[in-house]
């Protein structure tokens, strides 16, 4: 597992990572997708573009790398260094008002960002679905918690801590025909990678705690519209 993402330069990860390793997350997510060369993919909430680099290099797709933060100029320089300036197009835009016409994209990818902008009821169906072609594929990595941590009587209103089954119900209510929804096998590894890159002095005891924290689950969901 994660053979493809292992080959990337750690200096690139250190420069662009802003959370659990997006290369690992995108690698495992796309194993459950059917991306083909030449497809036009919307990478929404892409941060500094690690997921976009992976999509373009590993699948030969063209990517609109969209994030609301002011990373576009940095991302342009990074893409040039990676030889991807003609395959990945960085765009600074709000997810609620994307400047693309209806039916533009063959697929939507969103890695560890959806909870930042998409949790208003109807958001996916009204704001994102129209941008996708009929039958387009959707793949997301979402923050959540392990199913085994749910106790009887839990009233979990915070979407950041939803389980896979709760996320599945949410997206089905938003019009997505869900095909897979499960916790990522690389969850612990992706979090530890981030911790060691940003805190080189982190102790083994601190790293051990990652595997026991139910609030650090990462959920992958794929489906079609």
Residues of each region from the PLM?
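Conserved SAM-binding loop and adjacent beta-strand
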Residues: 11-27
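Class I SAM-dependent methyltransferase SAM/SAH-binding core
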Residues: 42, 48-97
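A short acidic, Gly/Pro-enriched loop at the edge of an enzyme's catalytic core
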Residues: 96-108
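A short SAM/SAH-binding and catalytic strip from SAM-dependent methyltransferases
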Residues: 107-120
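A short glycine-rich, Lys/Arg-flanked "PGG" loop and its adjoining helix->strand segment in the class I
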Residues: 122-137
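Short, glycine-/aromatic-enriched active-site segment of Class I SAM-dependent methyltransferases
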Residues: 140-158
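Short alpha-helix
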Residues: 160-175
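Conserved Class I S-adenosyl-L-methionine
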Residues: 180-225
């Amino acid at each position: 597992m994660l053979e493809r993402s292992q080959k990337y330069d750690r200096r690139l990860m250190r420069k662009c990572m802003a959370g659990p390793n997006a290369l690992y997350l995108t690698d495992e997510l796309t194993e459950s997708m059917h991306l083909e060369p030449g497809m036009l993919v919307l990478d929404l909430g892409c941060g500094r573009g690690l997921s976009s680099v992976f999509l373009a290099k590993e699948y030969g797709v063209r990517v609109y790398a969209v994030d609301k933060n002011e990373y576009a100029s940095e991302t342009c320089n990074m893409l040039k260094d990676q030889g991807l300036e003609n395959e990945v197009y960085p765009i600074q835009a709000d997810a609620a008002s994307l400047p693309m016409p209806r039916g533009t994209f063959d697929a939507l990818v969103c890695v560890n960002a959806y909870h930042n902008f998409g949790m208003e009821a109807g958001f996916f169906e009204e704001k994102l679905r129209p941008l996708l072609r009929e039958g387009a594929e959707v793949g997301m990595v979402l923050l959540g918690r392990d199913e085994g941590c749910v106790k009887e009587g839990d009233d979990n209103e915070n979407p950041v801590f939803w389980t896979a089954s709760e996320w599945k119900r949410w997206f089905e209510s938003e019009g997505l025909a869900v095909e897979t929804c499960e916790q990522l096998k690389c969850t612990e590894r992706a979090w530890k990678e981030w911790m060691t890159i940003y805190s080189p002095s982190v102790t083994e005891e601190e790293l051990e705690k990652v595997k026991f924290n139910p609030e650090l689950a990462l959920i992958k969901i794929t489906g079609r519209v």
